[in-house]
Swiss-Prot record:
Belongs to the universal ribosomal protein uS9 family. InterPro entries: Ribosomal_Su5_D2-typ_SF, Ribosomal_uS9, Ribosomal_uS9_bac/plastid, Ribosomal_uS9_CS, Ribsml_uS5_D2-typ_fold_subgr. The keyword 4Fe-4S does not apply. Keywords: Ribonucleoprotein, Ribosomal protein. This is Small ribosomal subunit protein uS9. One of its GO terms (molecular function) is structural constituent of ribosome.
């Protein structure tokens, strides 16, 4: 008996998340660990639960995630993007809700590259008049 699964890929900064939604009780597993153990801050847990809260599907799907690259904030954003795409696959009627909240939009902001002659992307060395 094949189990129904919905897939979504999310990206944010340097992070990529491959998300599977399986009908279940609402457990979130990230790279084989529980979400509360994986993320150090509560805000990241709130970020990844946003699409489920918007569509009122908390507790109806188990979320299985493989995420790599970037830091915790980028990974949380990538997971949110992936969950939103997977929910859209599960029920296309969620599109208007997810789109209006901005969860289907790929956040294109990236780290600006460092330029030569500068200390960071825009930070110039200290100016000395004499």
């Amino acid at each position: 008996m094949a189990q129904v699964q919905y897939y979504g890929t999310g990206r944010r900064k340097k992070s990529t998340a491959r998300v599977r939604l399986v009908p279940g009780t609402g457990n979130v597993t990230i790279n084989g660990r529980d979400a509360q153990d994986y993320f150090p801050y509560e805000t990241q847990l709130l970020i990844l639960n946003q699409p489920l809260a918007a569509t009122e599907t908390q507790g109806t799907y188990d979320v299985l995630v493989n995420v790599d690259g970037g830091g915790f904030t980028g990974q949380a954003g990538a997971i949110r993007h992936g969950i939103a795409r997977a929910l859209l696959q599960a029920d296309p009627e969620y599109r208007s809700t997810l789109k209006s909240e901005g969860y289907l939009t790929r956040d294109a902001r990236m780290k600006e590259r460092k330029k030569y002659g500068l200390k960071k992307a825009r930070r110039a060395p200290q100016f000395s008049k004499r």
